[in-house]
C-alpha cells in the first residue's frame, strides 16, 4: 500500500501532461487499489492515452481543454470504457468569453462554464459526470457550489484550490469544504495544500471528523485554559 493509502486516501488524482506521464500512470495503476483520476489540461489527446493506461476517471478543465470537438473525442473514448468525467471548473482559468461577459470570475460565470460542458455531454447521451467549481477565494467557491447545487443533482467534488501553505490552506479548506458539507452539498473532497499530500489527507479527515462524518484517529478534547484552571498548564 502507498503512503497515501496508509493515511486514508480513497481516491488520487495525477496529472497527465505528456506520454511519459501516461506511461507512469499505467505503473501507478498496477501498484494501487485506489481509483486514479487523470488530470488533463490543454492537450486532449493525453486524455485518450490516460484511458488506455487504465485511468478510472478523466478530469478536464473547461477553461483550457479547447474546442467542442476535443471534448467529443474524450467522450467517445470514456464511453467505450464506461468511465466518468469530472468537469473541473477553476475560477483562475475561465473561458475568455465568460470573463468578458461577467467582468471577472463570478459564481455565475463558473456555473455557466460547467453548464456548457454538461450540454456537450448530454448531446452525446453521456451523464456519468462529476462537477467541481474551485476557487482560491473561499466565499466565491462556496457561492459557486451553492448556485450549482440549486440547479443540478450531479455529484460534486469540493475543494478550495491554491489554498496555500499548511496553516492558511487548512483554515480556508475547513471553512469552504466544511460549510458546504454541513449544508448537504458535496460528495468527495480534496484539501489543497502547498505541503506533503499526506497532510492534505489528514486535514481532510479532520474536517469530516468535525462534522461527525468520519471516525479515523482520536479526537482530542483539550483545555484552552480558563478561570477554573488551578495549575500552570504551560
Task: Name the predicted role of every residue range.
Residues 3-6, 28, 50, 74-78, ...:
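Generic structural signal for hydrophobic
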Residues 18-40, 73-85, 145-156:
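Alpha-helix-loop-beta-strand connector modules within alpha/beta enzyme cores
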Residues 46, 64-65, 91-99:
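Conserved radical SAM core fold
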Residues 8, 32-34, 52-58, 79-82, ...:
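Glycine-enriched alpha-helix->loop->beta-strand junction motifs that scaffold or abut catalytic
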Residues 34, 45-86:
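Hydrophobic or amphipathic alpha-helical targeting/insertion segments
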Residues 90, 98-234:
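Catalytic alpha/beta core domains of metabolic enzymes, predominantly
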Residues 1-3, 12-53, 234:
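N-terminal active-site wall of soluble small-molecule enzyme domains
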Residues 11-18, 35-42, 56-66, 110, ...:
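Catalytic beta/alpha-barrel core
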Amino acid at each position: 500500500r502507498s503512503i497515501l493509502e496508509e493515511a486514508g486516501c480513497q481516491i488520487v488524482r495525477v496529472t497527465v501532461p505528456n506520454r511519459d506521464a501516461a506511461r507512469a500512470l499505467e505503473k501507478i495503476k498496477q501498484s494501487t487499489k485506489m481509483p486514479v483520476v487523470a488530470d488533463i489540461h490543454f492537450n486532449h489527446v493525453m486524455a485518450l492515452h490516460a484511458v488506455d493506461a487504465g485511468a478510472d476517471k478523466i478530469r478536464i478543465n473547461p477553461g483550457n481543454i479547447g474546442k467542442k470537438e476535443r471534448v467529443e473525442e474524450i467522450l467517445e473514448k470514456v464511453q467505450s470504457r464506461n468511465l466518468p468525467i469530472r468537469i473541473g471548473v477553476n475560477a483562475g482559468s475561465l473561458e475568455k468569453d465568460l470573463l468578458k461577459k461577467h467582468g471577472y470570475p463570478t459564481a455565475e460565470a463558473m456555473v455557466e462554464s460547467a453548464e456548457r460542458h454538461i450540454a456537450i455531454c448530454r448531446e452525446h447521451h453521456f451523464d456519468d459526470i462529476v462537477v467541481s467549481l474551485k476557487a482560491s477565494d473561499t466565499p466565491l467557491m462556496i457561492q459557486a457550489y451553492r448556485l450549482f447545487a440549486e440547479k443540478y443533482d450531479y455529484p460534486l467534488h469540493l475543494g478550495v484550490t491554491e489554498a496555500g501553505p499548511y496553516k492558511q490552506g487548512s483554515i480556508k479548506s475547513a471553512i469552504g469544504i466544511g460549510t458546504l458539507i454541513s449544508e448537504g452539498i458535496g460528495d468527495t473532497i480534496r484539501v489543497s495544500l502547498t505541503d506533503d499530500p499526506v497532510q492534505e489527507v489528514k486535514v481532510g479527515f479532520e474536517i469530516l471528523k468535525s462534522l461527525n462524518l468520519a471516525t479515523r484517529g482520536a479526537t482530542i478534547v483539550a483545555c484552552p485554559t480558563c478561570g477554573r484552571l488551578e495549575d500552570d498548564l504551560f
